[in-house]
Amino acid sequence: MYNGILPVFKERGLTSHDVVFKLRKILKMKKIGHTGTLDPEVNGVLPICLGDATKVSDYIMEMGKTYHAMITLGKSTTTEDQTGDILETRAVDKNDINEDTIDQVLQQFEGHIQQIPPMYSSVKVNGRKLYEYARNNETVERPKRQVFIKDIHRISEVTFQEQTCHFEVEVTCGKGTYIRTLATDIGLKLGFPAHMSRLTRIASGGFQLESSLTIDQIKELHEHDSLHNELFPIEYGLKGLKSFQVKDSNFKKKICNGQKFHKKVLSQNVKEPFIFVDSSTQKVLAIYIVHPDKPYEIKPKKVFN
């Protein structure tokens, strides 16, 4: 039985659920979950939670992500990426656009921006996923959503090929950002139909691509009983939360039993959520929140045994 977080390199062609399914067979355990869907055609780091670490998956998903994305100007598609049918084309050559113009437009997308999620996505409208409407050739109004782009900049030269223009960007963003929609919107700002032609996630929830393991590597490590050495502790997935050190053994016992407390037990005023940590082992004991109906009280959200 494993308890911890494992950064997995998801290969192209696999769904996030495929990764979980394969790991359940290899590790012979059911309590495994991923931390946010990566589309099949996207590769990169996918943090996987094992055992008790599944309790912190929501918090890992809230952390930032970084991508390398190839943007192609000159063609738009039904899915906003390279897998869709072509919607519109417009020839692009060196006289139409330059690197300075592209860089100036990219800067306009930093900060909080509005996005309309793509039709081929799992966003729900009226109880149905958008891709269900798309597959039935139905139209539906898609609500705008605010997302956060911490940084976006170009990391390649601008190249021209077969009446299209290509350049790669690095994007650091918050939860819920659609990079293919970002690519399409960048194209619109530049005056051309566009789509995302390749995507790799290089960081997610504090985990880097360089430290990610392939499924084959995980299998080999498990068979040699050395996978434990590659696991990140549960605490790593909660590093963005305020923590309180607990020394008193009776207080520790009450926390582990899931008791509620008056806020005065805390050394300072907090907003939700926060964690109690065993001062001797530095292991997280529980995640607590302010009681929604009793603002003077704190209650457990997740307890770790």
Swiss-Prot record:
Gene3D superfamilies: Pseudouridine synthase. One of its GO terms (molecular function) is RNA binding. It comes from the Bacteria. The active site is at 39 (nucleophile). The keyword Lipoprotein does not apply. Keywords: Isomerase, tRNA processing. Its EC number is 5.4.99.25. GO terms for biological process: mRNA pseudouridine synthesis; tRNA pseudouridine synthesis. It catalyses: uridine(55) in tRNA = pseudouridine(55) in tRNA. HAMAP family: TruB_bact. Belongs to the pseudouridine synthase TruB family. Type 1 subfamily. Responsible for synthesis of pseudouridine from uracil-55 in the psi GC loop of transfer RNAs. NCBIfam families: TruB. This is tRNA pseudouridine synthase B. The gene is truB.
